[in-house]
């Protein structure tokens, strides 16, 4: 059964590479999600999350300032944010990193490069479990 996804949910896309943010944004738009905002690293993203009633976070791992894994840990440690689903899209395919992300509470993990179908499948899986 496919999860019923709220197409109006507010999504924050966090990646230091603007092209990657645009790719993710376009794929989300193709899936019907138009309510997206962008941040270029965890240091920029965290204050946005604290005051922005976001419903979902898509983040890269390797970024200057604050890495995606640290952003995830900060989200999970914050009473207001800890419920937020987080999807990590990264080139980091090492088993240790996938385990570290899982232990930190990531909801989904996609290794680049990826397709729209992979993104949709992960979103469906994440929202089935919420």
From Swiss-Prot:
Residue positions binding Mg(2+): 15-16, 60, 62
Main location: cytoplasm
InterPro entries named in the record: CheY-like_superfamily, Sig_transdc_resp-reg_receiver, ST_Response_Regulator
GO cellular component: cytoplasm
Cofactor(s) this protein cannot do without: Mg(2+)
Pfam families: Response_reg (PF00072)
Domain Response regulatory as annotated: residue spans: 10-127
Gene3D superfamilies: 3.40.50.2300
Chain positions with 4-aspartylphosphate modification: 60
Phenotypic effect of disruption: Defective in chemotaxis and reorientation in liquid medium.
Gene Ontology BP term (one): archaeal or bacterial-type flagellum-dependent cell motility
PROSITE patterns found in the cross-reference section: RESPONSE_REGULATORY
Signal peptide residue numbers: none
UniProt keyword list: Chemotaxis, Cytoplasm, Flagellar rotation, Magnesium, Metal-binding, Phosphoprotein, Two-component regulatory system
Origin: domain of life: Bacteria
Name the UniProt record assigns to this protein: Chemotaxis protein CheY-3
Species: Vibrio cholerae serotype O1 (strain ATCC 39541 / Classical Ogawa 395 / O395)
Origin organism lineage: Bacteria, Pseudomonadati, Pseudomonadota, Gammaproteobacteria, Vibrionales
